[in-house]
């Protein structure tokens, strides 16, 4: 899964988080983006706020979608590894290396699933800030 900072690595959770951090840059800088691109009332004639807000909204949605796909892809990949390790453990329940690896993968899977919750909070925060500043200039389409 390609990401702005490189390839999303599902095997190493630290790298996975680092790439997500880079992918969340647009959300982290939403206030700055709005302050520098959406005019206040006194400067409203100099910039097309409707177009600016529309472009920013589209960028946000694209970033949210790509992160969601990346996280879900890694969850799917890690779930498959967990399933395979469970099968191996069922065949050989005394193999400590399989049991240890299974625990490690299960922990990683739980951490990746928790990233979906983090993603929801980040997205909600960004959209709240966006709506506070752009609601008079641009109304995004309703998400089905």
Curated annotation (Swiss-Prot):
<dbReference type="InterPro" id="IPR019171">
    <property type="entry name" value="MIX23"/>
</dbReference>
<keyword id="KW-0175">Coiled coil</keyword>
<comment type="similarity">
    <text>Belongs to the MIX23 family.</text>
</comment>
<feature type="coiled-coil region">
    <location>
        <begin position="82"/>
        <end position="120"/>
    </location>
</feature>
<dbReference type="GO" id="GO:0005739">
    <property type="term" value="C:mitochondrion"/>
</dbReference>
<protein>
    <recommendedName>
        <fullName>Protein MIX23</fullName>
    </recommendedName>
</protein>
<dbReference type="Pfam" id="PF09774">
    <property type="entry name" value="MIX23"/>
</dbReference>
<dbReference type="GO" id="GO:0005758">
    <property type="term" value="C:mitochondrial intermembrane space"/>
</dbReference>
């Amino acid at each position: 899964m390609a990401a702005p900072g490189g390839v999303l690595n599902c095997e190493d959770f630290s790298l996975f988080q680092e790439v997500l951090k880079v992918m969340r840059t647009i959300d982290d800088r939403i206030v700055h983006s709005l302050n520098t691109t959406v005019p206040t009332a006194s400067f409203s004639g100099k910039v097309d706020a409707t177009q600016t807000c529309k472009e920013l909204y589209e960028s946000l949605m694209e970033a949210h979608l790509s992160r969601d796909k990346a996280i879900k892809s890694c969850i799917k990949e890690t779930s498959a590894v967990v399933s395979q390790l469970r099968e191996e453990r069922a065949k050989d329940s005394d193999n400590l290396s399989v049991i240890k690896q299974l625990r490690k993968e299960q922990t990683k899977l739980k951490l990746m699933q928790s990233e979906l919750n983090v993603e929801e909070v980040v997205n909600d925060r960004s959209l709240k800030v966006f709506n506070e500043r752009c609601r008079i200039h641009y109304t995004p389409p309703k998400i089905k």
